[in-house]
Amino acid sequence: MSHAIDELQAIIADLKTELETEPKSSVGVASNSRLARDRIDRMSAEVVDSNPYSRLMALQRMNIVKDYERIRDKAVAIVGVGGVGSVTADMLTRCGIGKLILFDYDKVELDNMNRLFFTPDQAGLSKVAAAAATLSFINPDVEIETHNYNITTVENFDRFLDTISQGGRIAGQPVDLVLSCVDNFEARMAINAACNERNLNWFESGVSENAVSGHIQFIRPGDTACFACAPPLVVAENIDEKTLKREGVCAASLPTTMGITAGFLVQNALKYLLNFGEVSDYLGYNALSDFFPKMTLKPNPQCDDRNCIVRQKEFQARPKPVVIEEKAVSEEPLHATNEWGIELVAEDAPQSNPTPAETPVMGEGLRLAYEAPEKSSETSEETVTAATADETSLEDLMAQMKSM
């Protein structure tokens, strides 16, 4: 018996040695054959192949963004690193975000491979650890912080609340934006409660179970509807989501729909963080008909979240911007029967003579290149009379021509 135990211990020791000597790339970290680049202190607009930020900084040259490098001062929290969340983190990392805080308690499985970002060699790793390793290799300039726990439990909710309230780019400051990429209503309600309590703007996102539609919603506490203002039936009826799931049945998943939803999410997050363009309050996507609905949801005065009611009152108490409207001057028509304002003049009305322009006073030694001759009204009348007297009929002219 003791001999068998010794053999098992020897096998375990060999496996540990093999694991330690295995290339780090097998667990999602860059190996010596794939050296990560050095950190870059400042973003440069120099157009060279070795500059990873040249195409991003081109947004300044094209007057889309005033100061793109401000993105390095921003911190974003992503809750849920699945099909939408992992792609969202990937895009923000490539855009050069200053800090990413990732929340998830799940592991990478082989059934995740139909989605984007994760690779089969990362199966078994926690999603936040696998994501952090890959993202750090893509852009080592981004500060990445990971939290591997469920935010919906009582003890972990307080940790989540403290992290988004004090985990900003500057220590002790809140994050600039929270992105919800979770796949259940319980987690969405937890994020909603935290952001309402700390008055943080956040985006909610989701993909339908049939994988052919998705949406994003920008929630500004007090200004727009929170997730509890117009809850889905599962939330409103306090139904346990776990009772709805059946054994052997899973939700459908398409990387295309998730990629499109993540793209909408990051695009609007960038517009909000860098202050360009128009941020959509709600943007949906229906893949079957390529339909993209947009709308704005107003907050519910009878919302069940007491912090939402507080934020609504605070928003209503804010001074509204004064909009100065220019009063339009209405031009009344000159004639009641003429809606176009055309002035009618009688045929026998005397024609007004134009007032001759005054000759400017010239300095000494200066003269005008041309001076228009002055015409008096008497001269004009004499000219017209003479022209009338000299008029000859057509018959007389023809007779004169024949006699020549």
Swiss-Prot record:
A GO biological-process term: protein ufmylation
GO CC terms, sorted: cytosol
Classification via SUPFAM superfamilies: Activating enzymes of the ubiquitin-like proteins
Disordered: annotated span: 372-393
Single Gene Ontology MF annotation: UFM1 activating enzyme activity
Binding site for Zn(2+): C226, C229, C303, C308
Catalytic center residues: C250 (glycyl thioester intermediate)
Binding-site residues, ATP: G83, D104, K127, N150, N184
Biased composition (Low complexity): 382-391
Documented effect of changing D111A: In strain: S1
Keyword vocabulary terms for this entry: ATP-binding, Metal-binding, Nucleotide-binding, Ubl conjugation pathway, Zinc
Known function: E1-like enzyme which activates UFM1.
Family: Belongs to the ubiquitin-activating E1 family. UBA5 subfamily.
The protein's name in its UniProt record: Ubiquitin-like modifier-activating enzyme 5
